[in-house]
Every structure is written in structure tokens, then in C-alpha cells.
Regions:
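An aromatic- and histidine-rich active-site surface loop
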Residues: 43-47, 95-114
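Donor-nucleotide binding loops and adjacent catalytic segments primarily
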Residues: 43, 48, 52, 174-177, ...
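Glycine-rich phosphate-binding loop signature in dinucleotide/nucleotide-binding domains
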Residues: 30, 87-94, 195-197
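Short amphipathic alpha-helix
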Residues: 15-28
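Active-site-proximal region of nucleotide-activated glycan assembly enzymes
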Residues: 112-190
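Conserved nucleotide-sugar phosphate-binding/catalytic loop shared by glycosyltransferases and other
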Residues: 4-10, 27, 32-79, 83, ...
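Alpha-helical membrane-targeting segments
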Residues: 60-92, 105-113, 129-137
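Residues at the starts of beta-strands that form the adenosine-phosphate
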Residues: 4, 32-36, 55, 117, ...
């Protein structure tokens, strides 16, 4: 295995997708680099990272909840750090990057104890708990919003913005203008999601895990819409609230409204 950059981006799309965008950019800049991810076997990264073509090494991890047992945390965290440290030593890891999520802390601690350079990327205006902990071992923290720098104390911060994966930017075929690109993507979206071409579409989403208040507000407002027969809804419920939202849609009178419910939409480029 050649020189490797190890990334931790897990739990939610807000962490995973910037990680995937960074992996693609690193590969474009240095095709000789090996890119690998650290993650958990039962979270979003377990599907998205392999789908993007990158290897995922799974380690034990758990949410950094405030009510977490003081007895459980050291045990599980210790196992995750040990597994990540072993991965670093088995590979020629020249740098590590944390994007937040459960596995960022184990990677940060493993990087610190092996002398591996570490960078943290924070996507939010208010830093998450995992990244704040990981930043203590980082050479620098890249932030999307300038105000996020206040949450990282004395650690050096750099305003970089949020990495955007190439798939969100439409690729035009030779000789294809923007109008043709939009028409092609529209046809693909109609086919992919089972939407109707003669209706206006409302897209509703609240992140990969879901936003219960958004979901409830949407299903609760359906009966008050005018001319619902002219509309359709593409609703991404999120993983945590999918079943209850499907049940809510089944319980309301649609009034001719065409509804497509998905747990997660990976083709946001459409």
C-alpha cells in the first residue's frame, strides 16, 4: 500500500458528503495517493463510502451523548482507538482528516499517538462535540463559517468553505447547452423518483437523519393546500423518522396530491 490519507466522516450526510468530496479532490490532485475511510458498520457511511468507490475500515464507536455511561465510553472508545491505531501502523498513512461523527475522535486520538498529521473540517457554524474533541490533536481546523472558529480555542483555523462533491455539478455532453442539460436531468428525475411531468414539484428534506418538526408540519398542512391535484411532493424523511412519517402520510387525505416518500435521496444532483 502506498502513501495513504485516512478520513473519518460518519453518521450523517453532512459529514459523509464533504468527506467524499475531499477524497475525490485529493485523488485528482494526487492520483498516486491511497484514500481510505474509517467508519462504523451500521451508519450512513457504510453504504455511501463503498458506493463512491473508496475502502471503508469499520471500527467500534458510539454516539458522544451527554448521558453516556462513564463506564461504557472508555471501553468502546479504547477499542476504536486501538483498531484505528493498528490501521495507521499497517498502512503508510501520511495524514488524517476528521469531518465529524462518531469515528472522528478515535481517529484523532490514534493520529496523535502515532504522530500522524491531522486536520479537522467543521461544516457547521456551531462546532459539533466530536470535532471539538478531535481538534485538540489537530494541526489546523478548516471551517465552513467564520464564526465556527470561536469554538476551537487556540487551535489554528482556516476558512475554506464546505467541499462540494463533483456529482452535484451537472456534466454537459459535447455540444450540449444548459437548457438541454436541465431537460435531460429533469427527465431522469421523473423516471428515478416516479414523478409526474405535468405537475409542479415540492421537494422537502431535513437532513439524512430527518427533521421531525419539518415532517410533521408537512403532513399536517396537506389538508389546507389549494389545488393539490396540480402538485406533487418528493419527501425525504430521514432515517430516524421514516416509519412514523410514512404512517402519517397514510393517515391523511391527499386530495389528489401525488406523494413520493423516500428515506434518503442520494441523487440530489437531479
Amino acid at each position: 500500500m502506498g502513501e495513504t490519507v485516512l478520513l473519518a466522516a460518519g453518521g450523517t450526510g453532512g459529514h459523509v458528503f464533504p468527506g467524499l468530496a475531499t477524497a475525490a479532490a485529493l485523488h485528482d490532485a494526487r492520483p498516486d495517493l491511497e484514500i481510505a475511510f474509517v467508519g462504523t458498520a451500521d451508519r450512513l457511511e457504510a453504504r455511501l463510502v463503498p458506493e463512491a468507490g473508496w475502502p471503508l475500515h469499520t471500527v467500534p464507536a458510539m454516539a458522544l451523548r451527554k448521558d453516556l455511561s462513564a463506564l461504557k465510553l472508555p471501553v468502546v472508545l479504547g477499542r476504536a482507538v486501538s483498531a484505528t491505531r493498528q490501521l495507521i501502523r499497517q498502512s503508510d498513512v501520511i495524514a488524517a482528516v476528521c469531518f465529524g461523527g462518531y469515528t472522528s475522535v478515535p481517529l484523532a486520538l490514534a493520529a496523535r499517538t502515532t504522530g500522524t498529521p491531522l486536520v479537522v473540517h467543521e461544516q457547521n457554524a456551531v462546532p459539533g462535540r466530536a470535532n471539538k474533541l478531535a481538534s485538540r490533536a489537530a494541526a489546523a481546523v478548516a471551517v465552513t463559517f467564520e464564526q465556527a472558529a470561536d469554538g476551537f480555542g487556540s487551535t489554528r483555523t482556516v476558512l475554506t468553505g464546505n467541499p462540494v462533491r463533483p456529482g452535484l455539478l451537472p456534466d454537459a455532453a459535447p455540444g450540449e447547452d444548459l437548457v438541454a442539460v436541465r431537460a435531460r436531468l429533469r427527465d431522469e428525475a421523473l423516471s428515478t423518483f416516479g414523478l409526474r411531468p405535468d405537475r409542479r414539484t415540492l421537494l422537502v428534506f431535513g437532513g439524512s437523519q430527518g427533521a421531525r418538526q419539518i415532517n410533521r408540519a408537512l403532513t399536517g398542512a396537506v389538508g389546507r393546500w389549494t389545488r393539490p391535484e396540480e402538485l406533487q411532493v418528493l419527501h425525504a424523511t430521514g432515517s430516524r423518522t421514516h416509519d412514523e412519517t410514512v404512517a402519517a402520510w397514510e393517515a391523511v387525505e391527499h386530495g389528489g396530491l401525488h406523494v413520493v416518500v423516500e428515506e434518503f435521496i442520494s441523487r440530489m444532483d437531479l
